């Protein structure tokens, strides 16, 4: 009599299952970055969306905690236990992504980017947690595991902090831009104050001029690449004024959006944020270009790029609903100030262009 045996499905070892899950989660990231909304605006329910997204995020956080705890206990989890928790983590992560896909673009590109970035942080954070569990010795929870688990929890908790409309999202992004440009402006001012190579030397004893011309050049910079020449210092003045104008422009734009921005004007708010986002990187490029050794042609190029972005940002703001008074003079004044700075920079860098 032939005996029948029930086939037993083969399960990979626990660590191999974790490695496979980490790969699966990372394969989802490109899909999230380019994914389109799956619902029309008519089907979108704002309150239901935020509730669903937050609940899905909290589920991922809970599963991440269970996963970390399971691999911190003795004995180590069986292949069956590992399969079960891996499936739960995968399902929870897919639910977060599915919730994101229900957020339509016409609710605001700025807000949608914030939601997308939050989801990416959750998915990537979970994959990093799996990496940490794979790297740690079996049955020996390391600080890295706990940190990774906490990072997942923090990413999940941040979902509740996401602005709930595009105006609030725009203000958040503009505030970040203002802060970044403020930091760059203060850094540049501090560099100008502290990088005078002759500070405290020429003023100490004018009569003892020979002390500044000894054989070793004691007290004087020996490398001209480490300090500003007189020509550099003259060029820095309009560059600093241009950075100052950038900071003032962003602050003014943020104030206008805060005071006059309308939640239903999502496209105009997105346009303002998009162009304003370009200001900080352009400021950074200019600030970096004025550090010694200074290439005057590079300063001219980075200045022109910043001026182009600034004027475009001011013009887009002026043409939008956040500027209810066409006769408001501050935008033309800022544009004139920016143009004046650029004219001066062109004048001071003309020799570099002609070489």
From Swiss-Prot:
The modification N-acetylalanine is found at residue 2. Induction: Expression is induced by partial hepatectomy. This is Cyclin-D1-binding protein 1. Its main location: cytoplasm. Residues 2-187, 235-355 are annotated as: Interaction with RPLP0. Residues 203-224 are annotated as: Disordered. Residues 2-181, 147-355 are annotated as: Interaction with TCF3. May negatively regulate cell cycle progression. May act at least in part via inhibition of the cyclin-D1/CDK4 complex, thereby preventing phosphorylation of RB1 and blocking E2F-dependent transcription. GO terms for cellular component: cytoplasm; nucleus. The gene is Ccndbp1.
